[in-house]
Amino acid sequence: METAERVNLLGLDGAALSDLVGQWGGKPFRARQLQRWIHQRGADSFDAMTDLARDFRGQLAQQCRIQALPVNTEQRSSDGTRKWLFDVGQGNAIETVFIPEDDRGTLCVSSQAGCAVNCRFCSTGHQGFNRNLTSSEIIGQLWWAKRVLEADAGTARLGGAGNDDTRVVSNVVMMGMGEPLLNYDQLLPALRLMLDDNAYGLSRRRVTVSTSGVVPMMDRLSRDCPVALAVSLHAPTDALRDELVPLNKKYPLAELLAACERYLASAPRDFITFEYCMLDGINDTDQHARALIQVARQVRCKLNLIPFNPFPASGLKRSPSARVKVFAQRLMDAGIVTTVRKTRGDDIDAACGQLAGEVRDRTRVAQRNAGRTIPIAQVQA
């Protein structure tokens, strides 16, 4: 019972940790020391913090804890991608993915156990929704991955956070399970820790929040913690996006694009990334490309085309590679900066849209999906 009542320091940002230490009469520099031990050195025991006074360490041990989520499984892909399944209790589990590349190491972090947005092409959405993650559970994914990856690479650091080009985890994308902006109050302290020089010290350009288009929270993020922004677009018209991304019925394209333009005033990059999952016969025709060009010209953006990663419940197919290339070329010919995402980790179900974890659904999403009677292929561009 005592352990459950102790404060988990893992999810406290710098201000909250300073407030806590201040309640005990401690100086702000003590909070910074503590933060460096936890997030830069990966300490999970107060006894290891030898430059802190013994009495202070004793007080910490009595009233606080450093506790990440239990790891159920780890899988490794043939391409080097790694996926961890974290137990979040009551029969639920979330997934976190590390994607190594020559010039970076990207960690894909989850924000919810499941997702209530229920996008048609996303395995997480088909699992339904159980609960939001806490800030400790969000940042704990980075804390764990950093410890494990640096230990494996033999590069664990005893000093500062390093620079973005030398650390094992150089980029974080909030593109795992869940809609981050529907868990804003827990997301915000986690983002602040990612950016804090006494924690992970990542630049704002290297932390990306992906959203399906929660317009009010996009505005709040631009004020509170403007990091790079990616928007799950996936359709160039409201009619089609209503079917693919049901949140569009609440925040249609005109509102979403206006919010993107507002966000750019504070963004660390001079463009918004639009994510577009390529679905065979659904959103990949010449007509869709022409409509998408008109959308893209309204906001400074980059288009990221994502080959669909099939899963049984979707009833959808991946666009053929040749069609994806033609689609991308039409966008580029129109002057739209366009990339095609390379599929990584699909042999361990770690690719984009495949994360499902284990979710005890509280939203009866399967029943709602069964009630959809309009074949999506009939929706016109």
From Swiss-Prot:
One of its GO terms (molecular function) is tRNA (adenine(37)-C2)-methyltransferase activity. The active site is at E95, C352. Residues 101-347 form the Radical SAM core domain. Binds 1 [4Fe-4S] cluster. The cluster is coordinated with 3 cysteines and an exchangeable S-adenosyl-L-methionine. InterPro entries: Aldolase_TIM, Methyltransferase_A, RlmN_N, RNA_MTrfase_RlmN, rRNA_lsu_MTrfase_RlmN/Cfr, rSAM. It catalyses: adenosine(2503) in 23S rRNA + 2 reduced [2Fe-2S]-[ferredoxin] + 2 S-adenosyl-L-methionine = 2-methyladenosine(2503) in 23S rRNA + 5'-deoxyadenosine + L-methionine + 2 oxidized [2Fe-2S]-[ferredoxin] + S-adenosyl-L-homocysteine; adenosine(37) in tRNA + 2 reduced [2Fe-2S]-[ferredoxin] + 2 S-adenosyl-L-methionine = 2-methyladenosine(37) in tRNA + 5'-deoxyadenosine + L-methionine + 2 oxidized [2Fe-2S]-[ferredoxin] + S-adenosyl-L-homocysteine. Disulfide bonds join C108-C352. SUPFAM superfamilies: Radical SAM enzymes (SSF102114). It is found in: Cytoplasm. Keywords: 4Fe-4S, Cytoplasm, Disulfide bond, Iron, Iron-sulfur, Metal-binding, Methyltransferase, rRNA processing, S-adenosyl-L-methionine, Transferase, tRNA processing. Its cofactor is [4Fe-4S] cluster. PROSITE patterns: RADICAL_SAM. It comes from the Bacteria. [4Fe-4S] cluster binds at C115, C119, C122. Its EC number is 2.1.1.192. S-adenosyl-L-methionine binds at G178, E179, S210, S232, L233, H234, N309. Gene3D superfamilies: 1.10.150.530, Aldolase class I. PANTHER family: 23S RRNA METHYLTRANSFERASE, RADICAL SAM CORE DOMAIN-CONTAINING PROTEIN. Belongs to the radical SAM superfamily. RlmN family. Specifically methylates position 2 of adenine 2503 in 23S rRNA and position 2 of adenine 37 in tRNAs. m2A2503 modification seems to play a crucial role in the proofreading step occurring at the peptidyl transferase center and thus would serve to optimize ribosomal fidelity. Reaction proceeds by a ping-pong mechanism involving intermediate methylation of a conserved cysteine residue. HAMAP family: RNA_methyltr_RlmN. This is Dual-specificity RNA methyltransferase RlmN. It comes from Bordetella petrii (strain ATCC BAA-461 / DSM 12804 / CCUG 43448). The lineage of its organism: Bacteria, Pseudomonadati, Pseudomonadota, Betaproteobacteria, Burkholderiales.
